[in-house]
Amino acid sequence: MMPAKKTARKRRVKKHVESGVAHIHSTFNNTLVMITDVQGNAVAWSSAGALGFKGSRKSTPFAAQMAAEAAAKSAMDQGMKHVEVSVKGPGAGRESAIRSLQATGLEITAIRDVTPVPHNGSRPPKRRRV
């Protein structure tokens, strides 16, 4: 019997970046927060689903707030101080995620809405009748 091979896992290298971009992608079902450096390389990320929220709880503003806090803390551990915010999507967690980023101590320099708007593209889903 052969001994089990130990696989060497790569240790995550802590980057030291002072300014970056916080991408908040807020959908109807989830909120993802990714903080990158200015070139677009990922520094930290979090989402409502990754924090343990399941089902319809993922789409709440509170879940978005927690996701933004987790991503911001991880980014601040790597030296992040200033951040530009770009928000994409129609979800409920847009504003609460921005407020949460500001509350953790990151200085927000600009807020951009980069929600894609179709020039009469595909047909939208039918209205829900509940």
From Swiss-Prot:
Q: Which domain of life is it from?
A: Bacteria
| Nucleotide-binding listed as a keyword | no
Q: What Gene Ontology molecular-function terms does this entry list?
A: rRNA binding; structural constituent of ribosome
In Gene Ontology terms, what is a biological process of this protein? translation
Q: Which keywords label this protein? A: Ribonucleoprotein, Ribosomal protein, RNA-binding, rRNA-binding
What does the UniProt function comment say about this protein?
Answer: Located on the platform of the 30S subunit, it bridges several disparate RNA helices of the 16S rRNA. Forms part of the Shine-Dalgarno cleft in the 70S ribosome.
Protein name (record): Small ribosomal subunit protein uS11
